[in-house]
């Protein structure tokens, strides 16, 4: 089951048919045993898989829970009304055509629950009730299957009209203020037990393709206006059927022909009529509806696409952190006790861990930064001027795998004017990135791989005021510092799963941080020097926008979502170290920690020769 996450949405509001119905109708079979519960269109649960065992959850319910939202309850349930329980926000109802779905959004008394010729309960459609759509909610729409199964769609013109009707529901929600919508297309209706029994698989496939193409064209008008997260259910279905073993499904039967609980398609040893029924091995519960295994796969799929922009945004953080680490490494060469009046060449390196960023759907990031470089310093007036080039690499291991490798170039200067010390650093980095986004789909896992390039620059200014006398071996000074970092990642395309692969846009990211602190530095006396620095820092920008993405198989619409932000805007940094001199050679080693609730370590080592 998917892990719950803190939600970026106020609620989830669903419109659709039986695939998303979370219990509008009563469970008539269970009433005979005195059990009052709701019907859902999937298999019942173990141990008996028969009434009065409850039905499993549909994908929309699973998705709401994964997003950290309240339970997704039916909007028009007679059971909840009789028990005096509040209505929910799931308007999806078994048997709904696209016209019924539109009615549940826009019409007075448009949310209707009942059977053939019988209405059990009705209430106003969503927008009739609320007037304006909640802009913070996540809207989920699916539909169209019943238009095919009920004989409404028999030709291309009818398939076109059906798709237009579903899109009109999107039109109404967007006009009323909805900003984020999940919209699913149709799988191949012919590749179901019902399609097999109809003898019209080829026709149903062709008309399903017409429906999906028209829906794509209608939704494309909202590209850039609102976020529409497309679900390519057709591609997902094809992927599952092509590799059923990956998903824990049976590999010895035609999954498109078999089902779990209906005699007309209960043709396997896993069906309800078998001695050891096991719905987890089958894709269909009846002639059209998924088992709980299918529902879980679809929920996982939707969840992965919703959270993908935040996950992919972490690559920008790795690039930013690489330049930040470069500046801290260069800053260690500018410590007053590290300098003399001679030319100096040096090699240096660093290692640091970062767990600084989190957001909704993204927990703490575990990243490592490493660098090794060579540089030179020359005396200029009352200070020093230098340059360095360093090879840098970084890794981010959770919740996505990102590897960074490249070069960072820095120019730096320090000057003294009386008791006032000033220093500046400017850096440029050019990096290659390898990214791997892991997706869980029920029991299956998919890895989406990609590669791209990144670049960025950073600038830092620092001022300090020396408290100790000029002739003292100690340089003790309070300081203030400001650092700015700007990065760019080129867009790329993921590979590894047609249903999941994304087109990722260029990413821009910046970071501003300021520090105040106290530094203490003793130049080498008898060949030994020490230093220490304590700083309080503040990140001046709270978040960066999440990455814009499109589904590669349905590129008509883009979405991003909530940006990446830190748990804490402030931090403490402590650095200490030791330096040794032997003739013209000098070795400096430093270590420190940075953070607030948790402290991440960093280490630096430098060796130089003066002449």
Q: What does each model-identified segment do?
A:
Residues 152-155, 159, 193-204, 243-264, ...:
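Solvent-exposed, glycine/polar-rich loop segments of beta-barrel outer-membrane systems
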Residues 14, 92, 140-144, 348, ...:
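Short beta-strand segments
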Residues 211-215, 220, 403-415, 459, ...:
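Transmembrane beta-barrel strand/turn architecture of Gram-negative outer membrane proteins
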Residues 314-476, 566, 588-610:
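Outer membrane beta-barrel translocator domains of Type V secretion systems
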Residues 301, 345, 349, 410-414, ...:
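Outer membrane beta-barrel transmembrane domains
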Residues 2-338, 351-358:
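Conserved active-site regions of diverse hydrolases
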């Amino acid at each position: 089951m998917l892990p719950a996450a803190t939600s970026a949405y106020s609620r989830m509001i669903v419109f659709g048919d039986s695939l998303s119905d979370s219990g509008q109708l009563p469970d008539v079979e269970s009433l005979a045993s005195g059990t009052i519960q709701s019907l859902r269109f999937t298999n019942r649960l173990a141990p008996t898989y028969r009434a009065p065992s409850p039905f499993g959850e549909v994908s929309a319910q699973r998705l709401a829970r994964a997003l950290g939202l309240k339970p997704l309850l039916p909007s028009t349930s007679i059971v909840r009304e009789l028990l005096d329980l509040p209505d929910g926000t799931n308007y999806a109802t078994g048997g709904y055509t696209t016209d019924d779905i539109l009615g549940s959004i826009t019409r007075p008394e448009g949310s209707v629950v009942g059977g053939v010729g019988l209405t059990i309960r009705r209430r106003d459609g969503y927008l009739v009730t609320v007037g304006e759509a909640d802009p913070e909610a996540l809207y989920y729409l699916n539909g169209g299957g019943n238009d095919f199964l009920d004989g409404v769609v028999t030709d291309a013109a009818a398939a076109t009209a059906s798709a237009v009707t579903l899109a009109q529901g999107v039109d109404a929600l967007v006009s009323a203020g909805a900003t984020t919508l999940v919209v699913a297309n149709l799988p191949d209706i012919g590749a179901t037990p019902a399609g097999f029994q109809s003898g019209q698989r080829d026709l149903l496939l062709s008309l399903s393709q017409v429906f999906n193409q028209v829906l794509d064209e209608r939704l494309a008008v909202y590209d850039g206006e609102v976020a529409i997260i497309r679900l390519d259910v057709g591609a997902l279905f094809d992927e599952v059927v092509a590799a059923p073993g990956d998903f824990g499904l049976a590999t010895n039967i035609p999954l498109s022909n078999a089902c779990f609980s209906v005699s007309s398609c209960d043709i396997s040893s896993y069906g309800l009529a078998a001695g050891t029924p096991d719905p987890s091995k089958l894709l269909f519960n009846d002639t059209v509806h998924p088992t709980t295994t299918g529902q879980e796969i679809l929920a996982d799929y939707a969840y992965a696409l919703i959270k993908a922009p935040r996950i992919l945004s972490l690559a920008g953080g790795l690039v930013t952190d690489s330049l930040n680490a470069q500046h801290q490494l260069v800053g260690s060469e500018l410590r007053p006790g590290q300098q003399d009046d001679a030319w100096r060449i040096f090699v240096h390196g660093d290692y640091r861990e970062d767990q600084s960023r989190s957001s909704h759907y993204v927990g703490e990031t575990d990243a490592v930064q490493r660098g090794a470089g060579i540089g030179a310093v020359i005396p200029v007036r009352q200070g020093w001027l230098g340059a360095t080039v360093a090879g840098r690499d970084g890794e981010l291991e959770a919740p996505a795998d990102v590897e960074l490798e490249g070069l960072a170039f820095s120019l730096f200067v320090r000057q003294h004017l009386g008791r006032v010390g000033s220093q500046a650093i400017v850096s440029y980095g050019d990096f290659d990135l390898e990214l791997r986004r892991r997706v869980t789909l029920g029991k299956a896992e998919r890895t989406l791989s990609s590669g791209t390039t990144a670049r960025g620059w950073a600038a830092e200014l620092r001022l300090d005021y020396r408290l100790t006398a000029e002739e003292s071996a100690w340089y003790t000074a309070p300081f203030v510092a400001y650092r700015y970092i700007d990065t760019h990642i080129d867009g790329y395309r993921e590979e590894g799963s047609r249903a999941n692969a994304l087109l990722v846009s260029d990413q821009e990211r910046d970071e501003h941080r300021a520090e105040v602190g106290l530094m203490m530095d003793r130049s080498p006396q008898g060949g030994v020097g020490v230093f220490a620095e304590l700083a309080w820092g503040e990140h001046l920008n709270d978040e960066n926008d999440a990455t814009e993405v499109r589904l590669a198989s349905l590129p008509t619409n883009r979405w991003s979502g909530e940006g990446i932000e830190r748990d804490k805007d402030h931090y403490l940094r402590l650095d200490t170290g030791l330096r040794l001199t032997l003739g013209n050679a000098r070795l400096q080693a430093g270590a420190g920690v940075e953070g607030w609730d948790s402290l991440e370590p960093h280490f630096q080592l430098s060796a130089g020769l003066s002449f």
